[in-house]
Amino acid sequence: MKFLTTGLLATAALAAAQEQQVLQAEDGMGQAPQRGSSIFDETLQKFQSSLEDGISHFWSEMKTNFKDYLPLISLPKKHTRRPDSEWDHVVRGADIESVWVQGADGEKRREIDGKLHNYDLRVKAVDPSKLGVDAGVKQYSGYLDDNDADKHLFYWFFESRNDPKNDPVVLWLNGGPGCSSLTGLFLELGPATIDKNLKVVSNPYSWNSNASVIFLDQPVNVGFSYSGSSVSDTVAAGKDIYALLTLFFKQFPEYATQDFHISGESYAGHYIPVFAAEILSHKNTNINLKSALIGNGLTDPLTQYPQYRPMACGEGGYPAVLDQGTCRSMDNSLERCLSLIETCYSSESAWICVPAAMYCNSAILAPYQQTGMNPYDVRNKCEDMASLCYPQLNVITEWLNQKSVMQALGVEVESYESCNSGINRDFLFHGDWMKPYHRLVPSVLEKIPVLIYAGDADFICNWLGNQAWTDALEWPGHKKFAEAKLEDLKIVDNKNKGKKIGQVKSSGNFTFMRIFGAGHMVPLNQPEASLEFLNRWLRGEWH
């Protein structure tokens, strides 16, 4: 789940936006000049010459008016670390790093690459009977510790219900940034949900039906994870993911022999290209990475932001949420937004990237947010903004905050929250939101297949934007992929065989799917469809 801008940041952005000049054509009709036209080129030159002054003014305004709200480090969570003696296993990264082997060329090398000496992995065997979550299925929970940086990432592993000795392993990451992957576990694709009476209800469409799944709370201070420091950009989090998987597969070599897939949604569109590239950068590793999956992700803002207006204004397959006047206003703001993003792409500096995010989110996202409709599903009103429009998150949070649950999982923090707005703010104010992480995707595609899937009722990371960036991505297979046609995606695996669940296009290692009737969280709205395409993808279909 991807946060919309918090109320504070939206207010700040609106204040800054009032200082911005809207690009308009000379005819005064309020239409933005088109790229490639002489009017556009002249206007762009004027804009670029004033950009530095505008950004300086933006930061001055922020410092003056919001100085009490801009600490760039989120507050640490209260915690009590359990002694190592209370854990079933403790894996030392230093022990792994110290192992040398002789290669085929006769030269000595480390058995496993990477800086691991500062990491430990603590493991607890979870008793399913105590929690009632997937009874009979082997489970582990625990923490990855970065002892140098005082970072502690919580994970919960579920073995496959089917054939764990042969089924693949999947890592699941929620987005935000700042949202717990236990949201995905209990609201979307995990082995159980929680009802309003705090009872555990089995999920027949869990992704661990035919795969073992790891749910990871990252970055630090998300969910049950904690730290005395912080992580405020995607690249910094990548090293932790590599360490977690390396130590986990070292402790459980029976899973290391299986195919491994990294998956996630929303802001994981930032995470996964970075994390996959980090794993693939290591030649000697025990991580058998075979593919990456991103659902309703934010990956290439420059290509995706132009699709917010069409999605909100009735061009995405659902009725318009916004009126024509608001839609025109979004059009008028778009060129300035895109110019800011382009400058961010060129510099990758927070000095530029933060104003880009603030202006674009104010001009392009805020009009939708102000309607009271659910930004994660254009078909519904937002029931409760405090719970990100999904009141069931409150029930899940209450269940996870029970002392008996926390004790059974070995949790070391005092409380759980589904999303940490401080983390979201940290990433935003370090410029991470608008950075061009899609540039890593071509190198990933050289080595593994990538699936981009999108529920077609989502606004915040909509299918139009995801289709647009996948079609536009420059990679050796670009031309064939862009020319490929969307074909019907139908169920083949069960009693509903032949039911149309979406559309798919694929070429080379790249696949795009549109899933019908699903919002931001595809497994929540279309559980049967999500398990269908997952199982087929893991079996190697489309790649």
Swiss-Prot record:
It is found in: Vacuole. The active site is at S266, D458, H520. It is an enzyme of class 3 (hydrolase). It holds the Pfam family Peptidase_S10. One of its GO terms (cellular component) is fungal-type vacuole. Its main location: other. Glycans are attached at N210, N509. Keywords: Carboxypeptidase, Disulfide bond, Glycoprotein, Hydrolase, Protease, Signal, Vacuole, Zymogen. Residues 1-17 form the signal peptide. Vacuolar carboxypeptidase involved in degradation of small peptides. Digests preferentially peptides containing an aliphatic or hydrophobic residue in P1' position, as well as methionine, leucine or phenylalanine in P1 position of ester substrate. PANTHER family: SERINE CARBOXYPEPTIDASE CTSA-4.1 (PTHR11802:SF113), SERINE PROTEASE FAMILY S10 SERINE CARBOXYPEPTIDASE (PTHR11802). This is Carboxypeptidase Y homolog A. It comes from Trichophyton tonsurans (Scalp ringworm fungus).
